[in-house]
C-alpha cells in the first residue's frame, strides 16, 4: 500500500446527523475514523432545524412513520436505536428539552447544543474531522477504499456514505451519494422533494389571494402509482442529472391522512398537513383536504339552513361556514364551492365537497424549499441491520442518502441517528 495515503479503519463522507452519529459509534468502538465534510462547518441542517431549536426526535417513532419502496427496511435499525436512547445522550449532557406536540422533542435552547454534543462525542472517540474536503473521488480495491479529496488522500477498510440528499441546496446539498451508488452499480430510487410546499395554478391560482390564511384540516394524497417509463432511466430533480438511476417498477402507494394545519401561500399550499401529504403526492395526482375535521361525519353543517322558513342564500351560507372556518376562507369557499341550488340535496353535496376538497397541484416548490429528499439508494441493495451494500462489502449508505423518508416531526433525525448507529456498530 502506498505510504502517502493517510490510513484509517473507517472513512465517513458527510458530517451531518447520520455521519456524525456513525463516526461517534465507530470511534468509541476503537476504530480509527476520518470524517470528511465538504462544507466549512459540520451539521448545518442540525443548526437550522426546528427553527433553530432542533426537533431531534419523536417519542412516537415507529416504522409506520416512514415511507420507502420497502416499508419494512427501517424496522431493524429503528428497533436497535430508539428515541429513548438518543434522549439518554441528550440528558447526559444536561441539554434541556421539551415536547412541543405529537411527541416532537425540541431543545429549550439552541440546536447548537446538539451539534456540540455530537462533536464532543466524536472527540471522545478520537474521530478526525476534516472540513472543506471537496473534489471527492473514490476507488475500491480488494482490501478497502481510497478516497481522494482537496485535503489529500485517505484509505480505509470501510467507507460510509452519509452525504444526504438534494434538499436545501444553499446548505451545500449535492448528489454525491447517488453518484457513488451508481459507481458501484447500486440502484437508486429517483430523488424527489418531500415535506415540501405544493404549487397551484390554472383554475386554482385564485387560492393564492388567501395567502396567510391557515386552517385545521385533514390532508391526504390519493393512492396512485409511481410511473417510470419501461426501459427509461428515472430522472432526478436536479439539473436533469440521472445519477445512473435505473427504472423503478410500478408501485401502488397507500393513502396516509394527516390532521394538522394548512397554510395558503403566495404560490399554493403549505403548513404541516400539506407538507406531510406532499411526501406521498406524485405529479398528476390529487391532493385532498377535509375542511371540516372538527365536525363528526354524521353531523350536519347546514342543519340550520334546512329548517322551515330558514334563509337560504349566500349570506346564510357564509355565516354557517364562518362558524367552523376562518372568515376569509369561509367566504372564499362559499363563493367557489357553494351549492348548485338551495335544496337539501344541494346543501348535502356542498358539505360532502368540503369534506373532500380536491386540489390538483401543478408541482412542488422543489428542493430549495423541501425539508428532506425522498428516494435515494434502493434499500434492496443494503443489509437492513448494518446498512452495508450487499454487492460491495465494506461500503455503507446511511441517513437521507437512503430511500427511507420520515414524516414531519423529528422522524428524519431519528432515522439519521438509527442508521448511523447501525453502520457505526458494523464498520
Name each model-derived stretch.
Residues 4-18:
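Beta1/beta-strand and adjacent pyrophosphate-binding region of the FAD-binding site
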Residues 6-8, 149-158, 257-259:
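Core beta-strand elements of the Rossmann-like FAD/NAD(P) dinucleotide-binding domain
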Residues 11, 27-51:
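Glycine-rich FAD pyrophosphate-binding loop
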Residues 11-13, 36, 135, 154-170, ...:
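Short hydrophobic core segments
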Residues 40-42, 47-48, 57-63, 96, ...:
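An anion/pyrophosphate-binding glycine-rich loop and adjacent beta-alpha core
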Residues 53-101:
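Glycine-rich active-site loop/strand segments that organize a redox cofactor
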Residues 131, 331-405:
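A glycine-rich dinucleotide-binding beta-alpha-beta segment and adjacent secondary-structure elements
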Residues 131-144:
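A conserved short coil-to-beta-strand element within the FAD-binding core of flavoproteins
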